[in-house]
Amino acid sequence: SSAEIWIYKPAPEKATGQAIVFCPGGGYSQLSIANGHNTCKWFAENGIVGVMLKYRLPNGHSEVPLNDLDKAVATVREMAGELGVDPHKVGVAGTSAGGYLAGSAGVMSESKPDFMVLIYPVVSSDPDKRHLGTFQQLVGKENVETEAAKFSLEKVVDSTACPALIFHSDDDKVVPAINAALLYEKLKANGVKASLHIFPSGGHGWGMSKKFKYHENFKAATLDWLKVINAEADKAAAKK
């Protein structure tokens, strides 16, 4: 199988110049495709080019999903003209294991995205904090104890990471909220711009569900932060 992308374009009069490549969750064993499409449609409704990425699952080959995401980001930058996108305004986003993938690009990729939005992301491989299934799929069950630490995002963050917006729910029983807090703490220790929202409830996997109590808060906080990032990109471009 190969990776695929679907592109949702905003109405030209609404376009912000930003694009976001979205990585659906699924514990690296499957993909919540529907939530990915819904999220990308919502981005487009708000002036952002939404790019839904159906990435290949790792099956123990840890480089596979990240290669797909890196290629998708590069493709969007190459197509910037026809998409009405500024190539310096291409971000990534994802939920759960997809949040881990987006975070991996923002922290580890050589050619990083310009920003990342991580929604209840898997971050840490520490035994008391991790979502075990994600790391088993990433490095192979037999390699988790020896290999997973080098893929623990909070352990590999440095000052080259891109700005981050992170969401989690305090009562998440699948991926503990401490994952989000650990990454935020390490981003700040490295001088990286980051914003963290931990909602009181909601559990895991709320995505774009209107049943999520903080759905409107989540949407507003995301758009507010993207506006800030957009203004900063414009300011940086004006200085050049």
Predicted regions and their residues:
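Primarily recognizes the serine-hydrolase "nucleophile elbow" in alpha/beta-hydrolase
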Residues: K71-T134, A148-A149, L153
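Conserved alpha/beta-hydrolase "acid-adjacent" motif
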Residues: K173-L182
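Catalytic nucleophile-loop/oxyanion-hole region of alpha/beta-hydrolase
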Residues: L31-I33, N38, M52-P87, S209-N217
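Short beta-strand/loop motif that positions the catalytic acidic residue
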Residues: T160, I166-H168, D172
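N-terminal cap/lid segment of alpha/beta-hydrolase-fold proteins
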Residues: S1-K14
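Active-site glycine-rich loops that stabilize anionic/oxyanionic intermediates
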Residues: P24-S29, D170
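Short beta-strand element of the alpha/beta-hydrolase
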Residues: T16-G25
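C-terminal catalytic histidine-bearing segment of alpha/beta-hydrolase fold enzymes
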Residues: A181-K240
